[in-house]
Amino acid sequence: VNAVRVATLDRAGVMLVFDGDIILGARSHKLSESKLDAFGPINWGLLGEVRIDIRFSDSAKARHDRPLQFQPGFESRIGVYTLFPGFPPSELVANIERGNIRGMVLNAYGSGNISYIYLDAIRLATDKGIAVVVTTQCLEGATLMHLYDVGRQALNSGVIQAYDMSKECIITKLMWALKRTSNLDEIQKIMHTNYTGEINVEGKLYGAKT
């Protein structure tokens, strides 16, 4: 009922309404399989709350009358890999050389840290036109890959850092980008474009406070 109430109001965008919280769709993440407050925003505040009345934060945008640009289509041939101590680069190389993926998401440590042993695999991927996106395994925070030499080398090899996007958003956005183009520069441009509040490339987290 609350979701229907919110949907009738003069607010734009995809939202998730759960347990009285109004969450930006592109920032939503399921936190628990059983709690009533099972969903929460990642790197972002609530868009609003449903109480006796409905209260929106300043970040909730009003509707507009511009025509909807509907651009369907998603590329499902991507691989998602979580790095861990001992994860062999050969696993990445094998998938790259099979030629059955067009994009890769690497869940790295901390602020997007990887080991030097993965650089050759990354270069092989980008040389073959495979988009490589690096994100953090942490639930909150952002990638800051320029902090260390190995991160800078990865960026120079064509890695696309995810900044503060959620994992769900990274995968969906990459699938959408790959359906639009095979040009790695264009894919990076799409990934770093803020369409619905899903990314902040300036490093300012928690931009929408209630």
List PLM regions with ranges.
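Short beta-strand segments
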Residues: 15-19, 82, 107, 135-136
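Short, glycine-/small-residue-rich phosphate/pyrophosphate-handling segment
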Residues: 1-20, 24-28, 160-161, 183, ...
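Accessory alpha-helical/coil subdomains and C-terminal extensions
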Residues: 24-112, 193-210
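Hydrophobic helix-cap positions at the C-terminus of alpha-helices
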Residues: 6-7, 95, 125
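Short coil/turn connectors at secondary-structure junctions
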Residues: 9-13, 18-19, 75-78, 100-102, ...
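Conserved active-site and cofactor/substrate-binding residues in soluble primary-metabolism enzymes
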Residues: 9, 42, 87, 91, ...
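Short, hinge-like loop/turn segments at secondary-structure boundaries
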Residues: 1, 32-34, 149-153
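C-terminal non-catalytic interaction/assembly regions of soluble proteins
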Residues: 111-210
